[in-house]
């Protein structure tokens, strides 16, 4: 299956820890489970028009959840922490908000 840049990057992670890392030009995204580091790097550079220095990925296993006697499982996920170069501009997630 051929993944486009918009298929690879699912959504940004907006937590207190990830917001603090943005000061060091480190941005966290939920990415497609089958995407590798080079695909994530290419996708971030294309979508946000920045230069990527480094990509770290974390595979997360979905939790098992119960509702009464029914047992289900949440989907597995992959998180990517993308470090930008010093000369790159910052990625603004909240441009349109007032």
UniProtKB/Swiss-Prot annotation:
Cross-referenced Pfam families: Ribosomal_L23
GO molecular function, one term: rRNA binding
GO biological process terms on file: translation
GO cellular component terms attached to this protein's record: ribonucleoprotein complex; ribosome
Subunit (UniProt): Part of the 50S ribosomal subunit. Contacts protein L29, and trigger factor when it is bound to the ribosome.
Summary of the function given for this chain in its UniProt record: One of the early assembly proteins it binds 23S rRNA. One of the proteins that surrounds the polypeptide exit tunnel on the outside of the ribosome. Forms the main docking site for trigger factor binding to the ribosome.
The protein, known as: Large ribosomal subunit protein uL23
Protein species of origin: Clostridium botulinum (strain Alaska E43 / Type E3)
